[in-house]
Amino acid sequence: METTNLLLPSTRMTRMGMVNPTFIEDAVIVSEKEQKKEHPNFIESNTSGITLEELETNCIVPSFGDNQLTISHQTFIHRIEEAASMFFAGETFGNTEIRVSHKILGRHPSALTKRKEELKPEDETIYYQRMAFCFHIRTICREINGEEVHLCIGGVRSLNEENLYGKKSPEKFKIFIGWRVRVCSNLMLTCDGLTGRLEVMGDTDIYIAALKLFQTFNPEQNLRLLETLGRTMISQEQFCQIIGRLRLYQVLPASQMKELPKVILGDSNINAATKGYIDNPNFGLRGRAKISCWDLMQLLNEAAKQSYIDKFLERNQNATDFAVGIQKALRWEDTENYGWFLR
């Protein structure tokens, strides 16, 4: 993706309250190197960073059993970038961040008889089973609850969900759009910003699905929902009650669990959120007597970054939904039994 774009007249963003200028002055071209600052990754766990060029030049593209190619990771990324550039015409995009995991190694036929220690890089084939990427829109940013946030777009692909031994079949992808906190790179996904599992036969379907998602997502409405979380406070006693209930939830009988909101955060996520409550420099106690529901959401979203790539988006959305639900329970507006986590 281009790291700098010329600003062009845009007709897509009127619902966000932006002015559509008739004349646009030449944009100031800002080097990405000048703007780039160190920031945390949007997902951690067992992932590693990779560039788009490395994906295109160093990685093979696996095929199905009938030798039809799968849609490559880089093609997936390009289609989302193209859809974003079309829908958000005139905006300036940041670099695309790519995280991968579960490296699958193979050998070229000429290296079949070599021992492992004799292998050279050119003897091996590589592809990554799981991949997540995101990029933010630099020119669409806001400040809520004292934090700068950017509109962010991305996707997830997990080849472990495909039956590569069979004939070509619909391939599975996930696309998202939502706000991301600049200081910690935490995503704040809601149900209207996530496609769920998308099954497609070709990359054109990815492009179309991305446009549909962008059209139905309301950034300002989403932002107002997130902003209200900063107005509801949680005492230390209430936080401890929430953590205890989250642990208890995981061992409840299925019949009782059905009566409660769905929570898919695991033990490691809950432990990380608890630790963050004490020592997170941005959203922890920091000498305060209380934290807000906004802080709770950030602690849970930060903890969700330790999930595997194929579970990450759902857990991030679940963390956001949970914080919103707790706020409603504290305001006596609870209709989904989130109050159970406070009793």
Segments predicted by a language model, with ranges:
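Feature for intrinsically disordered/low-complexity regulatory segments and propeptides
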Residues: 1-81, 87-92, 96-100, 104
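Intrinsically disordered, low-complexity regions enriched in serine/threonine
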Residues: 1-35, 114-343
